[in-house]
């Protein structure tokens, strides 16, 4: 079930403060965050976030198509190494 419209999107306040400070200064430094749950707002467009995936920080550059999604959607936590090939000829 989606979030209620009267509540608005969730964004960690410390993350919003960092973006606002960079917008005031006019700088575009990488913002390191562990907040995968924060919703991407239009203010975030053009910024780069280093989103933690449980092991390292993955750089995520925000563009206009990402608005409304969560930061964690763009930093996958699991690496898919492929299915094991079923080699029936080698068993004989």
Curated annotation (Swiss-Prot):
Task: Please provide the Gene Ontology terms (biological process) for this protein.
Answer: ribosomal small subunit assembly; translation
Gene Ontology CC annotations of this record? cytoplasm; small ribosomal subunit
Q: Classify the source by domain of life.
A: Bacteria
Which controlled-vocabulary keywords does the entry list? Ribonucleoprotein, Ribosomal protein, RNA-binding, rRNA-binding
Coiled coil ranges: none
User: What PROSITE patterns does this protein's entry cite?
Assistant: RIBOSOMAL_S19
MF terms from GO for this chain are: rRNA binding; structural constituent of ribosome
InterPro entries with a match to the protein in the record: Ribosomal_uS19, Ribosomal_uS19_bac-type, Ribosomal_uS19_CS, Ribosomal_uS19_SF
Tell me the HAMAP family matching this sequence. Ribosomal_uS19
Entry-linked PANTHER family: RIBOSOMAL PROTEIN S19P FAMILY MEMBER (PTHR11880), SMALL RIBOSOMAL SUBUNIT PROTEIN US19M (PTHR11880:SF8)
Say what the protein does: Protein S19 forms a complex with S13 that binds strongly to the 16S ribosomal RNA.
- Could you say which protein family the record assigns here? Belongs to the universal ribosomal protein uS19 family.
- Write down what this protein is called: Small ribosomal subunit protein uS19
Q: Which organism is it from?
A: Corynebacterium diphtheriae (strain ATCC 700971 / NCTC 13129 / Biotype gravis)
């Amino acid at each position: 079930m989606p979030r209620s419209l009267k509540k608005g999107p969730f964004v960690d306040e410390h993350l919003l403060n960092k973006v606002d400070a960079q917008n005031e200064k006019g700088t575009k430094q990488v913002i390191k965050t562990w907040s995968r749950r924060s919703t991407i707002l239009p203010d975030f467009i053009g910024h780069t976030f280093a989103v933690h995936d449980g092991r390292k920080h993955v750089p995520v550059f925000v563009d206009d198509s990402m608005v409304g999604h969560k930061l964690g959607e763009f930093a996958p936590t699991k690496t898919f190494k492929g299915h094991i090939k079923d080699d029936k000829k080698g068993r004989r």
